[in-house]
Swiss-Prot record:
It is a multi-pass membrane protein. This is Undecaprenyl-diphosphatase. Bacitracin is thought to be involved in the inhibition of peptidoglycan synthesis by sequestering undecaprenyl diphosphate, thereby reducing the pool of lipid carrier available. GO terms for molecular function: undecaprenyl-diphosphatase activity. InterPro entries: UppP. The lineage of its organism: Bacteria, Pseudomonadati, Pseudomonadota, Betaproteobacteria, Burkholderiales. PANTHER family: UNDECAPRENYL-DIPHOSPHATASE.
Length: 287
């Protein structure tokens, strides 16, 4: 196998990893940092590679929600109250991360983008998820690990996207800021933050997916603008392969997650985070 072929296979694998982990609460950035280090993926345009494969994931979620997204845009422009309120909530949730990111993201990447940080945040985040899920009592008769689609969390005050308040949306936005630290997980922070704020699990997941569109798109465009000079002709094939892999795998994951959360809690992801964090810590110690 030639070095060029091996490089493309690594790019394809990382694209799959991005698509599989972007929309579940396990931290796609953390996985890319750790796995990229494990497989020794070297690219002169590494930052651009990560940004472009994230575009693949973004396009996947936009494609899946295209009908609802068009309804939201049309309703907002024509003054439909529910859609205007939903757009307001997305903006409120988007702004904290946009402001904090614009000011501190460079420092955050310099200080926190390291496998050791990922190991710690994976474990801590896993225990926080277990704690939040424990606070969400299930209806009698639920199977172990199952969650009722609309009434499993007795503390929830928002069971649909339209019922989310401005205060709850802002709380989700503040939680999203924490996800700038690798290993925390953007989807994990926004979903768990939403549940703490009183949003029902499945609704919090859907809101997280919609919030991902402006957040990830904005971050990707900003990073691409800042790092476009790093793009080399040699890496174009790897970037294209990673983009397609991320798009296709994200298509599968988003649909699967929506089905999963209708009948299950996030405990399995919490235990996965804890186990992976311990494995990463052991690997770092053994190096």
């Amino acid at each position: 196998m030639t070095d060029s072929t091996l490089h493309l296979l690594k790019a394809f694998f990382l694209g799959i990893v991005e698509g599989l982990t972007e929309f579940i609460p396990v931290s796609s950035t953390g996985h890319l940092i750790v796995i990229g280090d494990w497989i020794n993926f070297a690219s002169s345009s590494g930052k651009v590679f990560e940004v472009v494969i994230q575009f693949g994931s973004i396009l996947a979620v936009m494609w899946i929600f295209r009908a609802r997204l068009w309804q939201l845009i049309r309703g907002t422009l024509t003054g439909v109250r529910q859609e205007v309120n939903f757009t307001r909530n997305l903006l409120l949730a988007f702004l904290p991360a946009a402001v904090i990111g614009a000011i501190f993201i460079k420092s955050i990447k310099q200080v926190f983008y390291h496998p050791g940080v990922v190991a710690v945040t994976l474990v801590v985040g896993g225990f926080i998820m277990l704690w939040v899920e424990r606070r969400a009592p299930h209806t009698p008769g639920d199977a172990p690990g199952a969650a009722d689609d609309t009434a499993s969390d007795e503390r929830a005050t928002a069971h649909t996207l339209e019922q989310i308040s401005a205060k709850q949306a802002l709380g989700v936005g503040v939680a999203q800021c924490v996800a700038m630290i690798p290993g925390v997980s953007r989807s994990g922070a926004t979903i768990i933050g939403g549940m703490i704020a009183g949003i029902q699990r499945k609704t919090a997941t859907e809101f997280s997916f919609f919030l991902a569109m402006p957040t990830m798109l904005g971050a990707a465009v900003y990073d691409l603008y800042r790092n476009i000079g790093l793009l080399s002709q040699h890496d174009m094939s790897a970037i294209a392969v990673g983009f397609v892999a991320a798009f296709l795998s994200a298509l599968v994951v988003v649909r699967a997650v929506l089905r999963f959360v209708a009948n299950h809690t996030y405990r399995v992801f919490a235990w996965y985070r804890i186990a992976l964090g311990l494995v990463v810590a052991a690997w770092i110690y053994a190096k």
